[in-house]
Amino acid sequence: MRIISGSAGGIPIAVPKTLLRPTADRVREAVFSMLGERTEGAAVLDLFAGSGSYGLECLSRGAASCVFVESDRAAGPVIAANLKKAGLTGGTVATAPVESWLKAKTGQFDLIFADPPFLKQKGDRDWDAVLLASEELTGLLAPGGVFVLESFAKSAQPPPPGAPWSCAVERRYGDVVVRLFLFSLPAPDAAAPGPADL
């Protein structure tokens, strides 16, 4: 894995030994192609950060700050080491369960990334449902912000009825689906947002 572009482009990303499914470079490259210049000056939140690859990419591309949230204690030092190796500033690592952190946090972010454990078998947590129904998460997204959710393609869930999310872009890459959500409470006859809204 590596940082794809920006001031730290090409620098390898160390991965925690406990991380089973790091986001592939080609998926991240596609995501940032869709986001365009939105990273410049952005306040970023990287949930289920793992190696920190999404947040590192944002900082490399000019984001003002990034909070990396990851419950695995082994990941925090790895993210910190990745930041140092890449010479990136503005990164803060929070070692905490995502749900607990969301409930305690205030402030707003222009870009929120979430790459939770996949729902692959009975008994796995349905993080799509949890995140898309989270009032705490919607409260953290700044006006005009984007929520990027990476999911297992076979179990990706739409927002629950009444949830204020509109899916602007959806792309599948093998077993992975990436969706870009906008916070929206449209009128009943309003047109659904599309890529042009990003």
Where are the regions a protein language model picked out?
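Class I S-adenosyl-L-methionine-dependent methyltransferase catalytic core
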Residues: 1-198
